[in-house]
Amino acid sequence: MINISFPDGSIKQFAKNITAYEVANAISMSLAKAAMVAEINGELQDLSIVIDNDCKLRILTAKDPECLEIIRHDAAHLTAEAVKELFPETQVTIGPAIENGYYYDFARDKPFTTDDLAVIEAKMQELSQKNEQVTRELWDRDKAVEFFKSIGEHYKAEIIASIPAGEPITLYRQGNFIDLCRGPHAPSTGVVKHFKLMKVAGAYWRGDSRNEMLQRIYGTAWATKEQLDSYLLMLEEAEKRDHRKLGRELDLFHFQEEAQGMVFWHDKGWSIYNTIEQYIRKKIRKNGYTEVKTPVLVDKSLWEASGHWEKFRDDMFALETDDKTLALKPMNCPCHVQIFKQGIKSYRDLPLRMSEFGLCHRNEASGALHGLMRVRSLVQDDAHIFCAAEQITDETVSFCKLLTEVYKDFGFTDIKVKFSDRPEIRAGSNEVWDKAENALKEAVEQAGFNYTLNPGEGAFYGPKLEFVLTDAIGRQWQCGTLQMDFVLPERLDASYVAASGEKKRPVMLHRAILGSLERFIGILIEEYAGRFPLWLAPVQVAIATITSDLNDYALEVQKALIDNGIRTDFNISPDKINYKIREFSNQKIPMIAVIGKQEQENKQVAIRRLGTTDQEVLSVEQLIAVVKEENEKYL
C-alpha cells in the first residue's frame, strides 16, 4: 500500500500502481469527471500517470488557474488536428501556450485565409464534441524520427532528431492525429470548448530569419464561455484605444518606412512628451537625484569592458570611423559609471543618485516593431543609484515610494511586483546573493507591496524587481524595474573610499519608473483612450466663438491663457458653434471655452468639460486659476 497526502491535510492508503484518475474516481465520480491533470509532488502530470510511491497529490479541474495553460496547449493540438484533417498536405511544427492563448506554426505552400480560419474553427468544434481520448505514448527516438519522416512530417522529425539519443520520446495521440509533446494534457478533446482563432501571421522556422517562413495561427482558449466573451470584449475595446489609431486621429505622432522604429513627434504629441519629462524631472529633484547627460555614440572599447558588446552586439547600431568602431548606446549604465569615476568618491558621497533622460538605440527586428510600444530609438527615464551594501534596503524603499507616487498621479493604483532571484549561472557568492535578496525583500515589504517570485529569473549580476501596472481594461504592463548589480562597478573599476580608509566597490541599482517615454506614452494613450487629464493634455482649453464679431475678445482670452502657461487652441471661423464644439470634442480637449455676446460683455467664458453638456460660466481669471491649480499639482 502507498500513502497519498491531499491538500486538505488528509492521508489515504491506496494499492500500488494506481493511476491519478483512479484516485480521483475513488474520491468522487464528479471529481473524476471534472479532472484534467494531476499535481504530484508539485509537478503536473497526466491523469493516466501510475503512482507507485507515497506522494502529495492534487487533482486539478478547469476551476484551477494552472489548468488554463493546459486548456490552451490542448487547443493548440486541436488546431493542428483540424488543420491536418482539412489540409492533409500541411506539415505541423510547434504549438505552445502563450499569454492569453496559443499559436501553432504550419508549413504550407498556400496561405491560410480568413475563410480558412472559420472552417478550421468549425472543425475544431466538431472534434471537441467528439470528445476523442488523448493518450500518451513512449517512443524510441530513432523510431519516432523514422515514423514522422514516413508520414511527411519533416519538421517534426528534425525536432526529434535533435533530442539526445537514448532519451525517451513522448507522443500524444488523439483521433488520427499524433504529436510530439512533453505534456501533460487533459484526458480528452472535450475539455477544449471555449476558443476562437484570431489571426494568421508569418514566423520563421526555429525563429531564424535564414530559415523558411511558416504560417502561424494564433488562437485563444478559456475555461468558460464568460471568460472567452470577456476577453473578446476587451480586445474590441483595446482596438478602439489602439495608440497607433489614436495617434493619427489626434495628430500626436506618426511613423514611416524611411525611419522604421523612429517616432515623428507632432506638436501635440511632443507637448505630452515634454510635460511628462517636466513632471518626472520635478519628482527626481525632490528625491535627491542629480541629472546628467551622456554621449549617444561611444567607442566599442567601453562596451567591451562593460560586457555589453559580447551580450548585445547584434542589438546595437555600430559604425566605423577613423579606424574606430563606435556604437549607439543601447543603455546608459556604463556612461553613468564614467561620471561616477570622475574624482575620488567617499562613503560620505553615497548614496549617489544619478538620473538621465537617456537617448538609446536598439536594433529591433522590423517584424517586432509595434508603434510606440516597440521602437528602435527610445528615451529612458533612467537612473543609477551608487550605494553601499547597507544602504540597499533604504534606497529600494525610497524608490518604491517614488514609483507609487508617480503611478498614482497617472491613474494607476493596481501595481504588482515580481521578484526575480538568483539564476543558476551567476556572479558573486551565495552569501552576497543572500544579503542582496533579503535586502530587496525587506524593502518591498516595508513599502507595502506583496510580491510574486520568479525563481531563477534574476540577471547573472543581481536580483531584480519588476513593477507591473493594470490598465483600465485589465491588461498588464511591466514598466518599472529595479535591478541590483554587483558586476558592472567591478568591470569598470568604480570604487569609493570607505570609513575605514579602504577602497570598496559600490553596489549599483539600475532603476526606471516609466521604462521608456515612448512606450509609456503609448500605454497612457490607451489607458485614457486619448482623453488626457487636464494637466497632461496637449491642448488644455479650446476657445470657440458663437459669432465672428466676438473674435477680438476670443484672441484676448487666448493671450491671457498663453501668458499663464496654459496650452490653448481656438476656432474663430464662421462655422456653427455646434460644429466647433463637436470638432474640439473629437480632439478630446478637456475644456472648451464658449464665447457668446454675454460672455464678452461680462469678461467671462462658458466652460464645457469633455464628456458633458453642462456649462459653467467663469471669469477669465477664474479659468486661469482652475487650470494653473491643476498644473501646479504635477508640474
Swiss-Prot record:
Keyword check for Magnesium: no
Identification of the protein by name: Threonine--tRNA ligase
Family the UniProt entry places it in: Belongs to the class-II aminoacyl-tRNA synthetase family.
Cofactor: how and how many bound: Binds 1 zinc ion per subunit.
Residues at which Zn(2+) binds: C333, H384, H510
SMART domains named in the record: tRNA_SAD
Native source organism of the sequence: Rickettsia africae (strain ESF-5)
Location in or out of the cell: Cytoplasm
Gene3D superfamilies cross-referenced by the UniProt entry: 3.10.20.30, 3.30.54.20, Anticodon-binding domain (3.40.50.800), Bira Bifunctional Protein, Domain 2 (3.30.930.10), Threonyl-trna Synthetase, Chain A, domain 2 (3.30.980.10)
Entry GO terms, CC: cytoplasm
